[in-house]
């Protein structure tokens, strides 16, 4: 890196590329070749790869030249230069820079072998190529070409235009080829894949022109690919496309899994429903007329009869005949019809399960949930309601799981991309630092030299002047720095002028503070501020602050954004889109907020000075209101107009020229809060980010010239503009005027004015929301006047602010610009009110609603998230737009003609339907609809007119690319911009907005008034002094009680306060109000004698060292001991942790079985009778009774009994359907049961009251729920007894009994967990819901403006036909017809309309969920004017309104729910997760590895049989190859099943039968062989039992197929189940790791998903009972018919399951909205006393909307949250070095070495075992040394325990870690628990010690031998005898110390005593847990 970084940047780097340069390169190439002769062997190739230099990422072609290189010297733009990148020193390349400093790299070899780099033609080509105008022209050409492509019938002359385009593209390619060369060397034309695209497009153009290829239109569609050229022209798009391609690669595993799962489900569907969807009701018996007999010669044609449509039963108003089934729960036929297989399948024959391919399509449709309610209803009608189970499985496993896996994968890919970007940025920062250090050194040297020259203390000016004169003096530092990009003279002159001006102005004003002369040459004044209490003597310079706002400096964002400060991107907004920032979401983007880019970094001096002239504190003009840093500022600062309308000028906030340099400003209340001593220095804040070191070094390094440069680059406007601004936009003409300004400023900036304006906004919104149709003229008049008034108010506000702030500063603030825009529009609208067609301007008034965002953080956050996403998504949106465009054009070119020619196939009137591709707009709409997820219906039309293959391909591509990939990437970006930090930032930003301030002021006022009244009362009614104190005491009691219970705020009584004369309290009393701004709405302001400690989250306070001592010292003379509570938990979250009191259970071991007090202390004090003596008399009996009740209630059986009762009572509710009247017995039983249940529940409640006492009972939310439900039952019981059961109110109370099942919630742990999590999320869900409502309000009001009253139409009810415009034009025409005695004609409204805002909301909900939206859109598109008959597509561009709403209203807001829920769960996990947070990543990995290996134990392998033949079979069966062969057979069997179709011939059927027989024989053989080899052990393995059952069923199925099919399901289904065995094969395939991860994620999510499923079932249960009691008798129409209705419990559940995914809820709602005359109030229902079939619109809307919000938005999104969470965990685990499978294989191999499962292995086998393992645990031979080094403990008999080996091997893979021991201990406990072993083995030695013993024995032997040899004894026998004895002796001696020292070694084999201790501890722990569980129960 050193070489690369220290390449000297600056003007010297720019060297023109000359023939000498080329010669140098060639010389270097030759040298390098000589240096490194190529290696003969390829052995170390890889290492070389790593060590090779890599190209510098900042100097890549296409990127901007890094800032550090300065400006390009004159004359070197567009001239070939030598390459900057050292990497290319030995390659023939050169670079060229254009004016925008973009870098282009070319090959220095001759282009096309002719044109050298110095050739004139090539140089001209290069100049053209790199010029920005050239790319602009190409861009414009492409866009124009795109416009021409959208013509459906191009005019004649367009042919010539076509040639022009081709010519331009050819010219472009030629220029590129001449400039770059064609294809041989690097950087030539064809080396860039995007150029391949260009090349192919041009070739196609010429081929189609000169060669006749038949179908031209298909080839013309390839021209569309030209649109893709935009991607190659706009640099940022390439990155996004790269990311898309990455995510598609990552999706491969998910795709495989998806296809596999869908295939399995499709096979099941094929077997279950083959041919069912052709069942129709045919006229029966046949009417044998003459028509069927031709002169008696020909018989009856059965085929023709059943395929004749006229013989089918058609439901009125439906296009398809009615389906039916022959099972009891399927759809039935009416009288006179018989159910039989006839005709084709529904939907042109494309919806069926007749062949595998159609079944697969149906399943894909189910997975994407498009119009699946139709498939669901058809299938249940044809096959029976029981098959709902199939759909539940597919929707939950297929749809929710797989689709969200796609989302998870895309999100992960995005996250990885983001990480890479961040790392790159950090690396750049390091490089930048190194460069700056170098510059600094140069500069310091220069300055030292300068100092030496200029004797002593000459000012900087003098030095500069000397430099200017150039008399032997060194150059000024700015020149030395090599950054000097402009003539230094210019800059120096400017500096001088500025300095003089500053000095003169400073003198004039006589600044009280000393103005320091500029220490830096940037002309900025640095002021030294000393903090009041002199705790810090640091000079605070503006330079330090200005640094804070360098784009990308680490302090710019509030989060720890890792931004780069390397590639400074010249003038703010025009940054290079291809930069590393492309993918960054808002947090990590290089320049935090987009506003941040808009401002110049430094303030024009003059503006600053002027500004301060009336600020009253001119010296401090820079830091107006900066109380945070300078708390002792005078109050007068408040008037300074730098304050924006919010009263806040923040460093990073809404950017303003001034704001960028100011420290954060605060409000008056905060100034008061922070006492004079509080030390709030922003350096402290910087340190808190853990970046101090980096910051300091950068601060010291950024050179003055660099800052100067920045200043230049940040000023976007020419100097004349600033002059103009100073003269005309800053009004300071007269002292009186300034006085007036101050007064206006005081008024306008007051928080109360803000409050008033906010109230006006809310009122104005209300006024706009009150518009409806039809309105009375008076009401209309009121609204018009209201509008004028509000316009007036807002205009006045704007003008006053303009006066107060000056236009220049007014428009620096984003909100003000917004206000100004809206006010101008409103005024314009007033002027143009009467102009026709401009009523749309009224819609702009709606934008006022957004002004609420200023004071409503969540709305602000939502807008920010949308803003950030749109920002970060800018490129993605462009890519999406290009995709939509391309597909729309392709669709139009390919299918447009077909739609016109074959229109009669899809339309009865032979008119083009609404959805077609005949022109571009409609084609675009179809593609957009596919992106919304609705593809199947338009695809059927397409397939019918244009053939199946092409349509399937195009639609699937749009669906997969557009919907599944790009839209999920959108969602991933949304979720990422939703990170917790955003929420935290909005929750409490430390800053209070004016609204909060005004509310606090009002509260203070009220509190003050209370105190005054209190004092007044006391003065009048003179009482004793004791009484005087008492109310305060009581107040304290109450407050303390309430606060301690609920708010988690510690309160300390301050005992010695004194009263002063007016009854307020001195000392703490008066002052505490200043400091406490309590979230709990100031609950203690009224009580001035409390010191309150409010916890502030550490991570949240903007300045960490907030010294609270000051607060207490000021408030309390003795100095109270209150410090800030560090352990607070409100870390920016949306849920509050419970007060700590609850977390520490008070230990009461001996008396925890005693009941709690009955009443609260307050009650006992007031009513003495509540207090009884429990020692004697009645009190004692009462106490015994309570204890008995307590024992009963706490008993497990009691709880079980109650759960049983709850389930029974809930079940009883399910019987109360419409048939209950006819079933007298059941009805009577239910009535009695109801009473019994009520009595039991009342008894239970009384018992609990007695046992727990009222306090405990009524402080538990679950008990409240029980209480309310029991109360409802009791009321209805009493009402029945008194005979009031028919009263409406009592009836509706009875429906509330549906809530009974809710009681089950608290009883089932799983559901309770989910509900608790949900309850935690409710506040933020409600918040988002509210924001969504506000957001939708705008669209709703707009809808009312556009469509109110326009949805009515004239309609003939008998023929069900709408009148055309020429027959009936408007309402009056229709009424005339009605008067003409035509009873069947009506003027009717669409049920879902925009007549008022409420109705608009419902319509928008349908559009957002894409259900029923078509009818709403059609009505809008046909609308004309209020009360006019609609005209078909007369208002076609109204589609755009819906498109915009879908993007913003549906897309962003609905996905926001997912964001909020995921975010919330993560936060709750953080708070309550415990162990996860306190572990490092390493520990987690260890812990997971250990967790996995602890639960396993070595199993005894199945012993090999002794019989020889059995043994051979055993070996054969247990081989892996055998398993794989069987798997392949299973797959083949599946393939043969796929071949089956409904219409197959007899011959085919026979072939399939025999093939199947062969497979059955194979599987039977497998089964028999295994049973023979494995003997009785065969049945100890689950999979074998499964196989056995399947084989038996298959054999039985072969013989009894007919009988089984008649009574049960088709036997082939069992074969499908066999597919489950494929799961086993996955372990054997190494490549399937990704799929294993996905399945593992599913397994991990199952428990949580089961809990959510339970909760969902409970919700469905309650709603279906509610639906039965309210909508049972609704008229059958739309989505409600004889099968799908609310008449019985089963039917209700079927309907509600369908709505869980929001499918078809519009159809179910429509009949419920019926009112007479659409329904009858007197209709009789046989067998029931109920009359009428009308619905109840309000109840219906509430029912469906609440159900959709609960199920579709919340519960289903919880499902998504869990899948995303577990997927990331599973991915992490699969990335771990050790996975589950590795441990599995470890144990499998272990079994071979330890056949008896003793858990020990002999030392001698260890080396073989280690070698037999698989990677990564394997220790390959030779491994003796390594195994010895592991120091494994051994027990007697030289055996080693398996867990010790596993630990050692794991440690070897994962590396050592200090925390291993603790984890290890836990693992051992687990292992010992799961493998209770009778014998305890104590280790006596270890492998290392054993080796040491062996080695020492050998050494001793050698020594002794030598000793003997020296002594001369050579008699062998004696020697050997002695040696043997000595050896064993010594060995024994050696071993004693080893055993003694061993117990310290921590292994699994532990002494018994320790185990007993552990067991004892475990028992204690269990007892404690049981106690806690008892207490948690109600």
Swiss-Prot record:
Entry-annotated residues carrying Phosphoserine: 518, 520, 1495
Compositional bias of kind Basic residues: 489-500
Q: What is its main location?
A: membrane
Q: Where does Na(+) 2 bind?
A: 373
Membrane-spanning ranges: 133-151, 159-179, 194-211, 218-234, 254-273, 388-408, 752-770, 782-801, 816-835, 838-855, 872-890, 954-974, 1198-1215, 1229-1247, 1262-1280, 1289-1307, 1325-1344, 1437-1458, 1522-1539, 1551-1569, 1582-1599, 1613-1629, 1649-1666, 1741-1763
Intramembrane residues span 356-380, 920-940, 1398-1419, 1689-1711
Q: Where does the record place its III repeats?
A: 1178-1493
Q: Which GO terms describe its biological process?
A: adult walking behavior; locomotory behavior; muscle organ development; nerve development; response to toxic substance; sensory perception of sound; sodium ion transport
State what protein this is by name: Sodium channel protein type 8 subunit alpha
Source species, please? Mus musculus (Mouse)
């Amino acid at each position: 890196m050193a070489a690369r970084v220290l390449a000297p940047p600056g003007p010297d780097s720019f060297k023109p590329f000359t023939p000498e340069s080329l010669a140098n390169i060639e010389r270097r190439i030759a040298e390098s070749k000589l240096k490194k002769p190529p290696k003969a062997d390829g052995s170390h190739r890889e290492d070389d790869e790593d060590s090779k230099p890599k190209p510098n990422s900042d100097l890549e072609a296409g990127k901007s030249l890094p800032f550090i290189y300065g400006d390009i010297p004159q004359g070197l733009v567009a001239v070939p230069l030598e390459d900057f990148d050292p990497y290319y020193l030995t390659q023939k390349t050169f670079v060229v820079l254009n004016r925008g400093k973009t870098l282009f790299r070319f090959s220095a070899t001759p282009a096309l072998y002719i044109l050298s780099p110095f050739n004139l033609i090539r140089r001209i080509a290069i100049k053209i190529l790199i010029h920005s105008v050239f790319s602009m022209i190409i861009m414009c050409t492409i866009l124009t070409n795109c416009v021409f492509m959208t013509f459906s019938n191009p005019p004649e002359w367009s042919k010539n235009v076509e040639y022009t385009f081709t010519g331009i593209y050819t010219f472009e390619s030629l220029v590129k080829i001449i400039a770059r060369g064609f294809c041989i060397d690097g950087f030539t034309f064809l080396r860039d894949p995007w150029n391949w695209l260009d090349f192919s497009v041009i070739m196609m153009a010429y081929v189609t022109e000169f060669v006749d290829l038949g179908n031209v239109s298909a080839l013309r569609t390839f021209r569309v690919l030209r649109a893709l050229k935009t991607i190659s022209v706009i640099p940022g798009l390439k990155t996004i496309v790269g990311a898309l391609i990455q995510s598609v690669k990552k999706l491969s595993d998910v795709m495989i899994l998806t296809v596999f799962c869908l295939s399995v489900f499709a096979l099941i569907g094929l077997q279950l429903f083959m041919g069912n969807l052709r069942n129709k009701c045919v006229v029966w018996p046949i009417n044998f007329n003459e028509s069927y007999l031709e002169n008696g010669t020909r018989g009856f044609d059965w085929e023709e009869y059943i395929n004749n449509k006229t013989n089918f039963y058609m439901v009125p108003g439906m296009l398809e005949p009615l389906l039916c089934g022959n099972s009891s729960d399927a759809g039935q036929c009416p009288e006179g019809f018989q159910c039989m297989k006839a005709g084709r399948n529904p939907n042109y024959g494309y919806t069926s399960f007749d062949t595998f391919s159609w079944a697969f399509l149906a399943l894909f449709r189910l997975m994407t949930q498009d119009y699946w309610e139709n498939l669901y209803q058809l299938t249940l009608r044809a096959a029976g309601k029981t098959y709902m189970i199939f759909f539940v499985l597919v929707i939950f496993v297929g749809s929710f799981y797989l689709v969200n896996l796609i989302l998870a994968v895309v999100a992960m890919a995005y996250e990885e991309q983001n990480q890479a970007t961040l790392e790159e940025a950090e690396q750049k920062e390091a490089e930048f630092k190194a460069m700056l250090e170098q510059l600094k050194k140069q500069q310091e040297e220069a300055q030292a030299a300068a100092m030496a020259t200029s004797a002593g203390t000459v000012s900087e000016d003098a030095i500069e002047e000397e430099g200017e004169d150039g008399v032997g003096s060194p150059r000024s530092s700015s020149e030395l720095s090599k950054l000097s990009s402009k003539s230094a003279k210019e800059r120096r002159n400017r500096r001088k002028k500025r300095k003089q001006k500053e000095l003169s102005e400073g003198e004039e004003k006589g600044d009280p503070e000393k103005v320091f002369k500029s220490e830096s040459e940037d002309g900025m004044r640095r002021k030294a501020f000393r903090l009041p209490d002199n705790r810090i003597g640091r000079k605070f310079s503006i330079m330090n602050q200005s640094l804070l706002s360098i784009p990308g400096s680490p302090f710019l964002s509030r989060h720890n954004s890792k931004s780069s400060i390397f590639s400074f991107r010249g003038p703010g907004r025009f940054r290079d889109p291809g930069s590393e920032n492309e993918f960054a979401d808002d947090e990590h983007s290089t320049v935090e907020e987009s506003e941040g880019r808009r401002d110049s970094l430094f303030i024009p001096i003059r503006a600053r000075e002027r500004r301060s002239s009336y600020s009253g504190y001119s010296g401090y003009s820079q830091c107006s209101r900066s109380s945070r840093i300078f708390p002792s500022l005078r109050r007068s600062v408040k008037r300074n107009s730098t304050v924006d309308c919010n009263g806040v000028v923040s460093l990073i906030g809404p950017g303003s020229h001034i704001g960028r340099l100011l420290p954060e400003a605060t409000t008056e209340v905060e100034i008061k809060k922070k006492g004079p001593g509080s030390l709030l220095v922003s350096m402290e804040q910087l340190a808190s980010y853990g970046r101090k070191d980096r910051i300091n070094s950068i601060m010291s390094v950024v050179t003055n010239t660099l800052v100067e440069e920045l200043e230049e680059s940040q000023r976007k406007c020419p100097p004349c503009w600033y002059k103009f601004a100073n003269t005309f936009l800053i009004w300071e003409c007269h002292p009186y005027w300034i006085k007036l300004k101050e007064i206006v400023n005081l008024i306008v900036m007051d928080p109360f004015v803000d409050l008033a304006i906010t109230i006006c906004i809310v009122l104005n919104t209300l006024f706009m929301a009150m518009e409806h149709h039809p309105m009375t003229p008076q009401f209309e008049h009121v609204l018009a006047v209201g509008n004028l008034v509000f316009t007036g108010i807002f205009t006045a506000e704007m003008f006053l602010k303009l006066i107060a702030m000056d236009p220049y500063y007014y428009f620096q603030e984003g909100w003000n610009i917004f206000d100004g825009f809206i006010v101008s529009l409103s005024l314009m609208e007033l002027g143009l009110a009467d102009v026709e067609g401009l009523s749309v301007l009224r819609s702009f008034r709606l934008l006022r609603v957004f002004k609420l965002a200023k004071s409503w953080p969540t709305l602000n956050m939502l807008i920010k998230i949308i803003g950030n996403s749109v920002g970060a998504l800018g490129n993605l949106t462009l890519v999406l737009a290009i995709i939509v465009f391309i597909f729309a054009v392709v669709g139009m070119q390919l299918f447009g003609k077909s739609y016109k020619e074959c229109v009669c196939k899809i339309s009865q009137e032979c008119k083009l339907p609404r959805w077609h591709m005949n022109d571009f707009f409609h084609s675009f709409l179809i593609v957009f609809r596919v992106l919304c997820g609705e593809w199947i219906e338009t695809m059927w039309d397409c397939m019918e007119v244009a053939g199946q293959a092409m349509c399937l391909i195009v639609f699937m591509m749009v669906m997969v690319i557009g919907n599944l990939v790009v839209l999920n990437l959108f969602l991933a970006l949304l979720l990422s911009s939703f990170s917790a930090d955003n929420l935290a930032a909005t929750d409490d930003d430390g800053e209070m907005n004016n609204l909060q301030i005004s509310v606090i002021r009002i509260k203070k006022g009220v509190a003050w008034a209370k105190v005054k009244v209190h004092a007044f009362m006391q003065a009048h009614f003179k009482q004793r002094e004791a009484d005087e104190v008492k109310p305060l005491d009581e107040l304290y009691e109450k407050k303390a009680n309430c606060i301690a219970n609920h708010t988690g705020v510690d309160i300390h009584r301050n005992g010695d306060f004194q009263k002063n004369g007016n009854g307020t309290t001195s000392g703490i009393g008066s002052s505490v109000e200043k400091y406490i701004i309590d979230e709990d709405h100031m609950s203690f302001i009224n009580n001035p004698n409390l010191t309150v400690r409010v916890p502030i989250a550490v991570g949240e306070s903007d300045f960490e060292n907030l010294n609270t001592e000051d607060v207490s010292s000021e408030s309390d003379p003795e100095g109270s001991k209150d410090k800030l509570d560090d352990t607070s938990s409100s870390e920016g979250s949306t849920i509050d942790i419970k007060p700590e009191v609850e977390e520490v259970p008070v230990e009461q071991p001996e008396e925890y079985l005693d009941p709690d007090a009955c009443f609260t202390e307050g009650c006992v004090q007031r009513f003495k009778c509540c207090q009884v003596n429990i020692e004697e008399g009645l009190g004692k009996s009462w106490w015994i009774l309570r204890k008995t009740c307590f024992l009963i209630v706490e008993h497990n059986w009691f709880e079980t009994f109650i759960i049983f009762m709850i389930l029974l009572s809930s079940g009883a509710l399910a019987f109360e359907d419409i048939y209950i009247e006819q079933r007298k017995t059941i009805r009577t039983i239910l009535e009695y049961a109801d009473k019994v249940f009520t009595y039991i529940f009342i008894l239970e409640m009384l018992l609990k009251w007695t046992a727990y006492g009222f306090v405990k009972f009524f402080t538990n939310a679950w008990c409240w729920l029980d209480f309310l439900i029991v109360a409802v039952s009791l009321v209805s019981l009493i009402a029945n007894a008194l005979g009031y059961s028919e009263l409406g109110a009592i009836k509706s109370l009875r429906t509330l009994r549906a809530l009974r099942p809710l009681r089950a919630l608290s009883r089932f742990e799983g559901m309770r967990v989910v509900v608790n999590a949900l309850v935690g999320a409710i506040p933020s869900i409600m918040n988002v819901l509210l924001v969504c409502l506000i957001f939708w309000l705008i669209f709703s009001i707009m809808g009312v403006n556009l469509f109110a009253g326009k949805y009515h139409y004239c309609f003939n009810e008998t023929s069900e036909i709408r009148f055309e415009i020429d027959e009936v034009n408007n309402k009056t025409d229709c009424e005339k017809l009605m008067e003409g005695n035509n009873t069947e004609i009506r003027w009717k409204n669409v049920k879902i309309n925009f007549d008022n805002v409420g109705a608009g909301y419902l319509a928008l909900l349908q559009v957002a969920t894409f259900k029923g939206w078509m009818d709403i859109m059609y009505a809008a598109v046909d609308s004309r004017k209020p009360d006019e008959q609609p005209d078909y597509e007369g208002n076609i561009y109204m589609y755009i309104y819906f498109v915009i709403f879908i993007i913003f209203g549906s897309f962003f807001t609905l996905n926001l729910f997912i964001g909020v829920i995921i975010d919330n769960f993560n936060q709750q996990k953080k708070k309550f997760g415990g162990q996860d947070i306190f572990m490092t990543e390493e520990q987690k990995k260890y812990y997971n590895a250990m967790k996995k290996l602890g639960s396993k134990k070595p199993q005894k392998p199945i012993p090999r049989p002794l019989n020889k033949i059995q043994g051979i079979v055993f070996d054969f069966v247990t081989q892996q190859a055998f398993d794989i062969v069987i798997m392949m057979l299973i797959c083949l069997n599946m393939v043969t099943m796929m071949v089956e179709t409904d219409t197959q011939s007899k011959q085919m059927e026979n072939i399939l039968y025999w093939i199947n027989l062969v497979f059955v024989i194979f599987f039977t053989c497998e089964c028999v062989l295994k049973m023979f080899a494995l003997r009785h052990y065969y049945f100890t393995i689950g999979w074998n039992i499964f196989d056995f059952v399947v084989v038996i069923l298959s054999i039985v199925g072969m013989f009894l197929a007919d009988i089984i099919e008649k009574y049960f399901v088709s036997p082939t289904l069992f074969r499908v189940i066999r597919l489950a065995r494929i799961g086993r094969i996955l372990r054997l395939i190494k490549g399937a790791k990704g799929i294993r991860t996905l399945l593992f994620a599913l397994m991990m999510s199952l428990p949580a998903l089961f809990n959510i499923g339970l909760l969902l079932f409970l919700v469905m249960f309650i709603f279906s009972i509610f639906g039965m009691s309210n909508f049972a008798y609704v008229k059958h129409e739309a989505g409600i018919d004889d099968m799908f209705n609310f008449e019985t419990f089963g039917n209700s559940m079927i309907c509600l399951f369908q709505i869980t995914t929001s499918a078809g809820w519009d159809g179910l709602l429509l009949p419920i909205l019926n009112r007479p005359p659409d329904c009858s109030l007197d209709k009789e229902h046989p067998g029931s006393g109920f009359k009428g079939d009308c619905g109840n619109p309000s109840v219906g809307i509430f029912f469906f909307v609440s159900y959709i919000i609960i199920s579709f938005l919340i519960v289903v999104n919880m499902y998504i949250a869990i899948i995303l969470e577990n997927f990331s965990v599973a991915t992490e685990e699969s990335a771990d070095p050790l996975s589950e499978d590795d441990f599995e294989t470890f144990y499998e191999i272990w079994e071979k070495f330890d056949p008896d499962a003793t858990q020990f292995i002999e030392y001698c086998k260890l080396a073989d075992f280690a070698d037999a393992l698989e990677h990564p645990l394997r220790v390959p031979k030779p491994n003796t040394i390594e195994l010895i080094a592991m120091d494994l403990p051994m027990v007697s008999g030289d055996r080693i325990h398996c867990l010790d080996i596993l630990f050692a091997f794991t440690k070897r893979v994962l590396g050592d870690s200090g925390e291993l021991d603790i984890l290890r201990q836990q693992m051992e406990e687990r292992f010992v628990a799961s493998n209770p072993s009778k014998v305890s083995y104590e280790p006596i030695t270890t492998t290392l010690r054993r080796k040491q013993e062996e080695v020492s024995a050998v050494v001793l032997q050698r020594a002794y031998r030598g000793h003997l040899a020296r002594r001369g004894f050579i008699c062998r026998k004696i020697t050997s005898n002695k040696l043997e004895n000595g050896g064993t002796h010594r060995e024994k001696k050696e071993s004693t110390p080893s055993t003694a020292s061993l117990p310290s070694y921590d292994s699994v084999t532990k002494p018994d005593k320790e185990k007993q201790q552990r067991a004892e501890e475990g028992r204690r722990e269990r007892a404690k847990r049981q106690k806690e569980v008892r207490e948690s129960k109600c």
